[in-house]
Amino acid sequence: MRSISSLACLLAALVLCAARPSFAQEPPVARHARVDALFAPWTGNATPGCAVAVSRDGAVDYARGYGMASLEYGVPITPESIFHVASISKQFTAFAMGLLEQEGKLSRDDDIRKYLPELPDHGKKITLADLVHHTSGLREQFHLLNMAGWRGDDLMTVDDVLWVMARQRGLNFEPGTEWSYNNTGYTLLSVIIQRVAGKSLRAFAEERIFRPLGMRDTHFHDDHSEVVPRRASAYSPRDGGGWSISVPVFDYYGSTSLFTTVGDLLKWEANLLQPRVGGQALVDWLRTSATLKSGEATGYGAGLTLGTYQGQRTFGHNGADAGYRSSVAVYPDSRLAVAVFCNASTAVPAEFVRKVADVYLGTRPEPVKASPLSVPEAALKDLAGVYWSAVTDQVVRLELKDGALRSVGAMTPLVPVEPGLFLVGESTEEWRFPAQAARAPREVHVRDTASALPARVYTRVDAKPPSALEALAGQYHSDEVDMTFTVRVEDGKPRVRWQRQKRTVLEAVGGDRFVSDALGTVTFTRAKSGQVDGLTFGTLRARRLRAERLPAPGKARSR
């Protein structure tokens, strides 16, 4: 009887072992060499590079740097190099808010205007949780400041963000009904935390998160001029070869501006696996998907992107600002965490993270796309055209170029893999053209397969512009960004100019609707008389701002 019992126990143990993925069974030296090989293109003293760190069961197994932290001074990247990690910052801001909630000082269900009374009342309650989960409907701060005249290399501060948000008279959508990635919410959270805690987010996080976890090389960077020893500079490629310095100029934080090392970040990720700070309930909140009012899961927790890879659960985040690129992923089923920071705008650390994980999990890279399907060129041409979303007011333009369907200006083609289904390179984006009903306009449904959210629907529209372009010329003022836009017709095309920005061409996409690189979708509006009385403009993340046409000298406004 004892032998049967022992056999049963052995079989049970084998089943449990088989059910849990095991790490690659190879000597550490061989495993580390395979990791090094992944970063071969980023080695040497003439290129920026990356830092990588891998932990297993909370202990660092491997950490190394590749390439240069400073091309000017020949300083190499090491695991101790400090990087700006951009949106990886968000999980710390959400956690800090959660710590204050544990103390009863705020609630995630509070209206944000309880703490930010200077913001307008949009007629719908926006909660702190909406800020955390990207469901607030607030417009994107960076896009708004650009529309207000800030250039990409201008200093942007918390006061600038509060100024432009206080001017807004509309939302992208009703709070809780959509998910749209948004930096504004996390910058506002940093202000709320400061007002509630009585100290800056930088000081609060240092006291309550970084110091207890031994993250000695981590801080929220709230002064762009502050000298940070061991900081890696960041770069973007120059036309014709070489590199340009590309560092962000921010004094706002919460949404970004965390400075840290790969080793410090893995100390934090270990806390999300086995909490030492904050407790299990708070960590669970970070790792739980938000849901919309419709009941749909967003796939985004509190500052963490949730997903699966190689059949395992994952959580983590990516970051990108100026020339800095970063990614971290945790595989809780295997107690594995991988962090990769790079200081070149052309690096893709998320791909490195997955490839390093494959080394440790003993898995092959997941196939990203199916085999291409042969589609007649005439059929592809039939899909080309201009498509518009009534929900987001955004436009996609598809063209047939070099025998392939692609978005206008895009390098990567849409690859057909099934009838009516196209994939885009190595991304998780898919474009589906459903069968048309008789006389119905053609649609394209664009979806991120890594997300639980539904596809965005675009309908094909007539790209014919209005016959009298000169009627669009004039000046238009938007109170929401305190800016006057001048429209002129040059070389047969409308062009827009505003303070401190380059002229941008308006490309016709149907009637009074145009698109531009800087202002997104621009739609001229008309009074009952038929005369142009204003325009709306906006991007996916800052939709439908309004500008009123200013009367020409000596003329009254049309009604």
Region spans (language model):
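Bacterial N-terminal signal peptides
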Residues: 8-18
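Sec/Tat signal peptide C-region and signal peptidase I cleavage site
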Residues: 20-24
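Peripheral terminal and inter-domain segments
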Residues: 25, 350-559
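Short, conserved catalytic-motif segment at the N-terminal edge
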Residues: 26-85, 105-110, 163-170, 243, ...
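Short active-site loop at a secondary-structure junction
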Residues: 41-51, 72-134, 173-184, 253-256, ...
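Short, small/polar residue-rich loop motifs at catalytic or cofactor-binding pockets
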Residues: 45-49, 322-325, 392, 481, ...
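Short, surface-exposed loop or secondary-structure junction motifs
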Residues: 66-70, 123-332
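Short, well-ordered beta-strand elements
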Residues: 316-317, 327-344, 442-447, 534-536
